[in-house]
């Protein structure tokens, strides 16, 4: 069957002060993922969503390295930012035949950020 993998953010799974438009948008992606999973499931199409946490990308490039290290140390179980390839590999894994019974999932790829915030 076909696969759809949307990209949201851990912000769609929780909330942070002063970025409500971003949080609302990412929560919307998660809702869309779940609705499409129900709608497209009968056609054999799985729809899932990756929710990345802190990643070394252009979006985080402007943050000072010591600030990033402190954030990761305090907030993630793995105490580091992810590399883009780690998120890409998890995204690809949802497209493999072995993920054929997985649908409607919002999967955190966040080094344990969401469990540390719980």
Give, region by region, the residue ranges found by the protein language model.
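Short C-terminal tail/terminal secondary-structure segment
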Residues: 14, 92, 103-118
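Conserved SDR Rossmann-fold cofactor-binding beta-strand/turn motif
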Residues: 46-56, 95, 108-110
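Short, flexible catalytic-loop segment of classical short-chain dehydrogenase/reductase
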Residues: 13, 51-62
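Active-site helix of classical SDR
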Residues: 25, 33
């Amino acid at each position: 069957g076909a696969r759809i993998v949307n990209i949201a953010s851990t912000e769609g799974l929780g909330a942070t002060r002063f970025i409500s438009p971003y949080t609302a948008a990412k929560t919307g992606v998660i809702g869309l993922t779940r609705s499409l999973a129900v709608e497209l499931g009968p056609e054999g199409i799985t729809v899932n969503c990756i929710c990345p946490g802190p990643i070394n990308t252009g979006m985080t490039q402007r943050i000072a390295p010591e600030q990033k290290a402190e954030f990761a140390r305090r907030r993630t179980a793995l105490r580091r930012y992810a590399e883009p390839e780690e998120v890409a590999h998890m995204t690809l894994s949802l497209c493999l035949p072995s993920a054929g019974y997985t649908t409607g999932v919002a999967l955190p790829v966040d080094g344990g950020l969401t469990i540390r915030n719980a």
